């Protein structure tokens, strides 16, 4: 805790130190394999060693390239837990339910390895810590991914906009069958966007304000 206070003071006084960086210094999009129609994976580059979203203090220095599918095909659900609207709902994320998500994730790891294996990165290279150079077969990849993969905080599409039987809101973001109720967040997206959800969600909110005002 003392170290965190010192880091905060350093940033407040000098605008320097660990708090002066976003910790995500670079990113990008790529195809996980040549037959993909469009870039289907997203990268986040950390010039640091991050474990469990930063909740675990690392015991070494390093850098990481996180890779994930842009459009996972697995589908979860959000359902009512009780009739009390103040109780928490049942949330089933259902990660990796679709086999193609696992295939894309394996391909993403291989692309990340190729990027970090370039000559320009060799002066900074060290031992691969995850998944580890010994992880090479589909079975080992799957074991690693199922045990170590983490969410990237992009839940969406649970109250989709549309005009089919699964749609919850219309083109004005109004909930079907209920008056004076709109939903304005990432849940109304029919499909997840290609990349982070913050900017598209702000756009949805801006549009909703126009509908309301």
In which residue ranges do the predicted regions lie?
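Mid-to-C-terminal "cap/lid" subdomains and adjacent gly/pro-rich loops that border
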Residues: 1-59, 114-119, 136-139, 144-147, ...
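Compositionally biased, intrinsically disordered low-complexity regions
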Residues: 30, 64, 128, 132-134, ...
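Active-site-proximal substrate-binding core of FAD-dependent oxidoreductases
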Residues: 123-136, 213
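A general boundary/transition motif marking the beginning of the first structured unit of a protein
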Residues: 16, 100, 132-133
């Amino acid at each position: 805790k003392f170290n965190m206070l010192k880091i905060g003071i350093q940033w407040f006084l000098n605008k320097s130190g660990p708090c002066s960086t976003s910790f995500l210094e670079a990113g990008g999009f790529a195809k996980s394999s040549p037959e993909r129609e469009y870039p289907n994976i997203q990268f986040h580059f950390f010039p640091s060693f991050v474990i469990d979203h930063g909740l675990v203090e690392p015991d070494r220095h390093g850098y990481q390239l996180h890779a994930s599918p842009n459009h996972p095909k697995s589908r979860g659900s959000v359902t009512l837990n009780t009739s009390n609207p103040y109780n928490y709902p049942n949330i089933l994320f259902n990660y990796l339910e679709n086999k193609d998500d696992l295939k894309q994730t394996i391909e993403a790891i291989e692309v990340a390895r190729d990027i970090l294996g370039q000559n320009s990165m060799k002066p900074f290279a060290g031992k691969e810590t995850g998944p580890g150079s010994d992880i090479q077969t589909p079975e080992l990849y799957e074991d690693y991914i199922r045990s170590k993969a983490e969410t990237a905080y992009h839940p969406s599409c649970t109250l989709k906009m549309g005009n089919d039987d699964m749609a919850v809101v219309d083109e004005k973001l109004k909930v079907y069958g209920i008056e004076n109720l709109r939903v304005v967040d990432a849940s109304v997206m029919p499909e997840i966007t290609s990349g982070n959800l913050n900017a598209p969600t702000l756009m949805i909110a801006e549009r909703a304000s126009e509908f309301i005002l």
